[in-house]
């Protein structure tokens, strides 16, 4: 009889641990580098309250094997296996499989060419501990069924039938025999999500202190106790771009072991006290949490913040006494999240690092783009002290291409990493968008942060005082919310956020929208700006809008806004802030050294190249927003860490694996 994996739907949590274990088992027990390679051979199905996992049944008279015209699918060692060399990707097996468990996977084999092959459960053939999905299911909902196991199952059921154990009078006895709660019962008994406390609303409206108060110990314990620990490598870990060991450090919080938790946190994350505050967890780890739909996700971000804040306040610092210095030096251009992450990993591998940045403090947009009410700037100052103690050297107020040349860096250092972010505001091409009273989001936020920090403003980034003004912010992302909430704190008489789609389709965090509303912001949805209106002095006085409805989805699956004919109106405004996103700024000093950029100005570098994130100049690596375009802090850090590994491999340094 062929062996197969059987799922117990009554025990299944729907946690996806089996999928992640499957993919890692076929990738040397490592996470794949991108979502494009995430092809589990087992699939979790959720429908209403039903949850189960589906995979190949290894049929005795397998339709996939019978349908294969090239003999690529056959019986091997009590299972049905695919011979990848024989497979021609004809899809006959996909059509023939009655359970829908066959896939065709495309694998790059040469420039512009791919090989299509059939993909199915192989029972982890050759794996010492057997099928990874069975080993890693936290609810024991999966088992490998053999002929012996099947016979034993049938015998057990016959005995239960003979004893009439399914009759009502046996129910109380059965309950007494099962004192240990199953994972499903634990999930059903999970208390509701607990949110962190906030500053009083009046204090929020007039000040720039962080609005979220840190978790108390009892709050952290309560939230940690809600985690089901869905497998060794859980879905929250996979959906985090850094692949943080989330359930493991939550377990350590439950045990009261903050020192071990912070060490584990720093194995994958350079700035956990930052990501705990500014990550959009609702779109990443918390959005994937197994208990999200029933009880609300575990507040992972607040636990992460709690771990770091507690440990750093107690004086925890990274121990690099075991690191052996190597005779290699790397220059990093940009002290933002990508650059700092790259510097961190290189330093932990003994490489000498100098970071160059044009700003007076490290952090890039963490420091100067994100307002203080979301991220206390003292955190970055403390982190600079930590990095400096680790041996990282900083050259601040130093702009590459102006104060120091790339030529000199290439001459002095063994490699260069470029993590400069994106600073050029996207324009909408509206009439009069360069008129007085119209501001780009980033210079507005940078000048505000410098004013709060007591730093000197620059002529090209003057402080904009919105006190008493009627302000309209165009855009629907987190940057737009930052502008809205900043203008309110400076005493604007009225602040409106205008967005061309509906609220459900806003790209920004729901949490940020909620906070903006609480602080007094107004929202105008389904409106598209067509022109900026000027008064007799040439100053902006309003915005001409068209109302919109949602049409067909675009390439990203978001429904396009379609203007409604005859719906034009003018919204009065004393100041307009345009928050449409960012593009990479020009870097002629980089392109002149053979570094290729795409038509949008993004540096061409890939995590899947021979050396991760190596550019077309082999001595120069790049990552973060300069490569992918404006994105999240956590994705920039992930790319900086990957690039550091690429540099280590290219330099021939013996790598110290962090996880």
UniProtKB/Swiss-Prot annotation:
<feature type="binding site">
    <location>
        <position position="15"/>
    </location>
    <ligand>
        <name>[4Fe-4S] cluster 1</name>
    </ligand>
</feature>
<keyword id="KW-0004">4Fe-4S</keyword>
<feature type="binding site">
    <location>
        <position position="97"/>
    </location>
    <ligand>
        <name>[4Fe-4S] cluster 3</name>
    </ligand>
</feature>
<feature type="binding site">
    <location>
        <position position="137"/>
    </location>
    <ligand>
        <name>[4Fe-4S] cluster 1</name>
    </ligand>
</feature>
<dbReference type="InterPro" id="IPR036188">
    <property type="entry name" value="FAD/NAD-bd_sf"/>
</dbReference>
<feature type="binding site">
    <location>
        <position position="90"/>
    </location>
    <ligand>
        <name>[4Fe-4S] cluster 4</name>
    </ligand>
</feature>
<feature type="domain" description="4Fe-4S ferredoxin-type 5">
    <location>
        <begin position="218"/>
        <end position="252"/>
    </location>
</feature>
<keyword id="KW-0411">Iron-sulfur</keyword>
<feature type="binding site">
    <location>
        <position position="236"/>
    </location>
    <ligand>
        <name>[4Fe-4S] cluster 5</name>
    </ligand>
</feature>
<feature type="binding site">
    <location>
        <position position="87"/>
    </location>
    <ligand>
        <name>[4Fe-4S] cluster 4</name>
    </ligand>
</feature>
<feature type="domain" description="4Fe-4S ferredoxin-type 3">
    <location>
        <begin position="78"/>
        <end position="107"/>
    </location>
</feature>
<keyword id="KW-0479">Metal-binding</keyword>
<protein>
    <recommendedName>
        <fullName>Putative oxidoreductase AegA</fullName>
    </recommendedName>
</protein>
<feature type="binding site">
    <location>
        <position position="230"/>
    </location>
    <ligand>
        <name>[4Fe-4S] cluster 5</name>
    </ligand>
</feature>
<keyword id="KW-0560">Oxidoreductase</keyword>
<dbReference type="GO" id="GO:0046872">
    <property type="term" value="F:metal ion binding"/>
</dbReference>
<keyword id="KW-0408">Iron</keyword>
<dbReference type="GO" id="GO:0019628">
    <property type="term" value="P:urate catabolic process"/>
</dbReference>
<feature type="domain" description="4Fe-4S ferredoxin-type 4">
    <location>
        <begin position="114"/>
        <end position="147"/>
    </location>
</feature>
<dbReference type="InterPro" id="IPR017896">
    <property type="entry name" value="4Fe4S_Fe-S-bd"/>
</dbReference>
<dbReference type="Pfam" id="PF07992">
    <property type="entry name" value="Pyr_redox_2"/>
</dbReference>
<dbReference type="Pfam" id="PF14691">
    <property type="entry name" value="Fer4_20"/>
</dbReference>
<dbReference type="InterPro" id="IPR028261">
    <property type="entry name" value="DPD_II"/>
</dbReference>
<dbReference type="InterPro" id="IPR023753">
    <property type="entry name" value="FAD/NAD-binding_dom"/>
</dbReference>
<feature type="binding site">
    <location>
        <position position="18"/>
    </location>
    <ligand>
        <name>[4Fe-4S] cluster 1</name>
    </ligand>
</feature>
<feature type="binding site">
    <location>
        <position position="68"/>
    </location>
    <ligand>
        <name>[4Fe-4S] cluster 4</name>
    </ligand>
</feature>
<feature type="binding site">
    <location>
        <position position="121"/>
    </location>
    <ligand>
        <name>[4Fe-4S] cluster 2</name>
    </ligand>
</feature>
<feature type="binding site">
    <location>
        <position position="64"/>
    </location>
    <ligand>
        <name>[4Fe-4S] cluster 3</name>
    </ligand>
</feature>
<feature type="domain" description="4Fe-4S ferredoxin-type 2">
    <location>
        <begin position="47"/>
        <end position="77"/>
    </location>
</feature>
<dbReference type="InterPro" id="IPR009051">
    <property type="entry name" value="Helical_ferredxn"/>
</dbReference>
<feature type="binding site">
    <location>
        <position position="59"/>
    </location>
    <ligand>
        <name>[4Fe-4S] cluster 3</name>
    </ligand>
</feature>
<dbReference type="InterPro" id="IPR017900">
    <property type="entry name" value="4Fe4S_Fe_S_CS"/>
</dbReference>
<feature type="binding site">
    <location>
        <position position="227"/>
    </location>
    <ligand>
        <name>[4Fe-4S] cluster 5</name>
    </ligand>
</feature>
<dbReference type="Pfam" id="PF13247">
    <property type="entry name" value="Fer4_11"/>
</dbReference>
<feature type="binding site">
    <location>
        <position position="56"/>
    </location>
    <ligand>
        <name>[4Fe-4S] cluster 3</name>
    </ligand>
</feature>
<feature type="binding site">
    <location>
        <position position="22"/>
    </location>
    <ligand>
        <name>[4Fe-4S] cluster 2</name>
    </ligand>
</feature>
<feature type="binding site">
    <location>
        <position position="124"/>
    </location>
    <ligand>
        <name>[4Fe-4S] cluster 2</name>
    </ligand>
</feature>
<feature type="binding site">
    <location>
        <position position="93"/>
    </location>
    <ligand>
        <name>[4Fe-4S] cluster 4</name>
    </ligand>
</feature>
<feature type="binding site">
    <location>
        <position position="133"/>
    </location>
    <ligand>
        <name>[4Fe-4S] cluster 2</name>
    </ligand>
</feature>
<dbReference type="GO" id="GO:0051539">
    <property type="term" value="F:4 iron, 4 sulfur cluster binding"/>
</dbReference>
<feature type="binding site">
    <location>
        <position position="12"/>
    </location>
    <ligand>
        <name>[4Fe-4S] cluster 1</name>
    </ligand>
</feature>
<keyword id="KW-0677">Repeat</keyword>
């Amino acid at each position: 009889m062929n062996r197969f994996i059987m799922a117990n739907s009554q025990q299944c949590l729907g946690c996806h641990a089996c999928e992640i274990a499957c993919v890692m088992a076929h990738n040397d027990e490592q996470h794949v580098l991108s979502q494009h390679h995430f092809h589990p051979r087992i699939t979790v199905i959720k429908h209403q309250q039903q949850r189960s996992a589906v995979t190949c049944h290894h049929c005795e008279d397998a339709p996939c094997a019978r349908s294969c015209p090239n003999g690529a699918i056959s019986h091997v060692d009590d299972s049905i296996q695919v011979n990848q060399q024989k497979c021609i990707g004809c899809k006959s097996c996909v059509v023939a499989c009655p359970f829908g468990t066959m896939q065709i996977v495309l694998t790059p084999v040469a420039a512009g060419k791919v090989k299509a092959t059939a993909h199915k459960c192989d029972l982890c053939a050759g794996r010492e501990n057997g099928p990874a999905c069975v080993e890693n299911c936290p609810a024991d909902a999966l088992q490998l069924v053999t002929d012996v196991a099947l016979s034993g199952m049938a015998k057990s059921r016959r005995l239960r039938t003979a004893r009439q154990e399914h009759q009502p009078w046996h129910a109380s006895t059965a309950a007494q025999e099962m004192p240990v709660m199953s994972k499903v019962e634990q999930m059903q008994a999970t208390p509701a999500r607990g949110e962190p406390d906030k500053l009083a609303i009046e204090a929020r409206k007039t000040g720039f202190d962080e609005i979220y108060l840190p978790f108390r110990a009892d709050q952290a314990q309560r939230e940690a106790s809600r985690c089901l620990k869905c497998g060794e490598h859980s879905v929250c870990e996979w959906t985090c771009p850094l692949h943080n060991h989330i359930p493991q450090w939550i377990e350590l919080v439950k045990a009261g072991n903050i020192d071990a938790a912070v060490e584990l946190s720093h194995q994958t994350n350079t700035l956990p006290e930052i990501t705990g505050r500014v990550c959009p967890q609702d779109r990443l780890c918390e959005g994937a949490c197994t208990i999200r739909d029933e009880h609300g996700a575990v507040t992972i971000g607040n636990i992460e913040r709690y771990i770091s804040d507690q440990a750093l306040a107690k004086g925890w610092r990274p121990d690099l006494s075991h690191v052996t210095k190597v005779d290699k030096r790397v220059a990093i251009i940009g002290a933002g999240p990508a650059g700092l992450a790259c510097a961190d990993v290189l330093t932990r591998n003994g490489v000498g690092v100098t970071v160059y940045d044009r700003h007076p403090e490290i952090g890039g947009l963490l420091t100067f783009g994100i307002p203080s009410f979301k991220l206390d700037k003292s955190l970055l100052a403390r982190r600079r002290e930590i990095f400096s103690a680790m041996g990282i050297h900083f050259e601040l107020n130093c702009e590459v291409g102006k104060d120091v040349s790339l030529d000199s860096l290439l001459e002095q250092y063994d490699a260069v990493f470029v993590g400069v972010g994106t600073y050029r505001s996207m324009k909408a091409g509206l009439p009069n968008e360069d008129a007085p009273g119209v501001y780009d989001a980033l210079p507005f936020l940078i000048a505000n942060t410098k004013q709060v920090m007591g730093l000197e403003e620059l002529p090209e980034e003057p402080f904009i005082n919105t006190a008493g003004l009627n302000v309209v912010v165009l855009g629907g992302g987190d940057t737009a919310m930052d502008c809205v909430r900043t203008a309110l704190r400076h005493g604007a008489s009225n602040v409106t956020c205008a967005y061309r789609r509906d609220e459900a389709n806003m790209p920004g965090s729901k949490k940020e929208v909620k906070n903006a509303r609480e602080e007094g912001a107004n929202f105008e949805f389904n409106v598209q700006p067509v022109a900026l209106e000027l008064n007799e002095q040439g100053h902006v006085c309003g915005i001409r809008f068209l109302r919109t409805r949602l049409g067909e989805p675009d390439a990203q699956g978001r429904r396009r806004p379609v203007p409604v004919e005859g719906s034009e109106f003018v919204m009065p405004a004393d100041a307009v802030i345009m928050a449409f996103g960012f593009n990479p700024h020009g870097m002629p000093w980089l392109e002149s050294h053979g570094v290729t950029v795409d038509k949008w100005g993004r540096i061409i570098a890939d995590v899947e190249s021979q050396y991760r994130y190596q550019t077309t100049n082999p001595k120069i690596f790049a990552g973060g927003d300069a490569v992918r375009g404006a994105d999240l802090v956590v994705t920039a850090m992930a790319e900086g860490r990957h690039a550091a590994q690429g540099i280590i491999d290219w330099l021939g340094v013996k790598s110290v694996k962090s996880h």
